[in-house]
Amino acid sequence: MVRELIAILRGVAPHEVVAIAEELILAGITKIEVPLNSPKAYKSIENLANRFSGEAIIGAGTVLKKNEVASVCNAGGKMIVSP
């Protein structure tokens, strides 16, 4: 069952995101956001995109600048959330 939620991995380090995302995906949560004000956010997005391509939609939140959109895309992100 896919749940219509977006999980926000705020403040989570890149080495922690894959294990957390595995549990979220098992629970049916397949949209995962990494806020850009998290530690090494682009690395987290890259780790998630590499591991879960085709299984989940990975993206970034707290996107404030146009150049950040390109950086998220370069890291493999497919979703942008802006305040």
What positions do the PLM features span?
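Ordered, amphipathic secondary-structure segments that act as subunit-interaction surfaces
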Residues: 82-83
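Conserved N-terminal beta1-alpha1 strand-loop-helix module at the mouth
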Residues: 1-78
